[in-house]
Each structure stands twice: as structure tokens, then as C-alpha cells.
Amino acid sequence: MKREFLPILLSMVMFVCACSEPSVEGPEQVDNPNNTEQEDPNNGEDNKEEAKCQAGEYYKSGLAEGIIAYVDETGEHGLLISLDEGYTQWSTDYIMLVVQGGEFSREDGARNTAYIKSQENWEDLYPAVVWCNGKNALGLSSWYLPAPGELAKAAQHVDAINATLESMGYDVIATGVNESYWSSEEFGVQGAYAISMASGDFADYGHDKKAYNRVRAMRKF
């Protein structure tokens, strides 16, 4: 009788130990014998806040890599500004562009850039656009010369952007009194708008197209 009882007792001990062994992965489990759905007291708001992007953060997804310059009201989309910059002319000649269907956009640099790239010999005539377009790969047109309004949005967060650039070893965005960045909006035959990243302001008269200014590319994400 004792010999028959011993194997049964051992099997019971092994079963209890296996069921009560703590999990080595994941958080501690809360008893929920009815397997009912647990209500989230925060309604998921904490997780949503953590997932939102912020201006000044480094961003990389696929071929998109840069610093977040602006975030829209969703917290998930906005504008990236390039990690590096160029120094070049807006145009090598005084030619006034006539935009088909209206004027240059104050807020949509991608549209402005696409129009400039549609011009004959654009690669010889528009060095600032060429520099920005050089960041595109696989035939894409994601990077562009930003519009004045897009640069102005980035200027609002220039301190946060520069802090990240500096921590990564890149040149910061210049904010000196006489430092400006080319936008993609033309101003007459001889001018184009250039933006002060210290204030986001731009001269009403534009800058000489043949003059040299700084250039940063932007793209949407």
C-alpha cells in the first residue's frame, strides 16, 4: 500500500510546483479568474502621450533621417530638417519663374521645389534645389528646399534642434544676425526669400539670387 501511495504523492508535489512557478518574462500577473477585460483607468492616454513626437528629437525611419523641426496637431506627423547643410546660390542667373496655376507657395516647399525641377536646365540654374535634391535616393523626391513658412516653423524650435545636432556631432543651425537660409520661394527676377533662423523672419525685398546663403533640406514624415 505504501509503495502505491508514494508515486501518487510525488506526482501531486510536482504538479503544484509547476503551477506556482513565477514567470521569468513580463510584468507580474494580476489574478483575473473570470478572464474578463480589465478597464484602463487612464483610457490609454499615458501611452498616447509617450508615443507623440517632439520637435528637436532625432528621427530615423527607412530612408528618412533628420531632426524633427515641427510636429502637427496629431503628434505623429510633421517636418524633418537635414542633419547637415550647404552654402550656395539660389540661382546662377536672373530668371523669373512663372508658376503654373498660381504663385509660389509660402507653406509648401515640396510644391515649389517640384516646379523648379520642372524647368529646363534646372540642375545648372538652381544650386540650392540641387543640393537638397541630392539627399533623395531611389528616384524619390522626399527632400526639398523648404518654403519660408516651413523654415519659420523650424525657427520656433531652433534651440531644441541645435541641442540634438550638437550632441550628435553635427554643425548647428546658424542664428547669427547676418545668417540666413534659402527658401524655395522666388521674389521677382533677381531675388528669393531667405529666412533668419533666429527669428523666423524674412526680408520683404528678398535676397539676391546669385548671393550665397546657407541651405537645409526638409521633408515630411
Role assignments for model-derived ranges:
Residues 1-17:
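Sec-dependent bacterial lipoprotein signal peptides
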Residues 14, 135-136, 158:
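Hydrophobic, Leu/Ile/Phe/Ala-enriched alpha-helical segments that form helix-helix packing faces
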Residues 16-56, 221:
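Bacterial Sec-dependent N-terminal signal peptides
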Residues 20-27, 148-221:
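C-terminal, surface-exposed recognition/capping segments
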Residues 40, 44-137, 179, 191-195, ...:
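Extracellular adhesion/carbohydrate-recognition regions
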Residues 138-140, 175:
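Short helix-terminating capping/connector loops at secondary-structure junctions
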Residues 140-146:
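Surface-exposed patches in mature extracellular/periplasmic domains of secreted proteins
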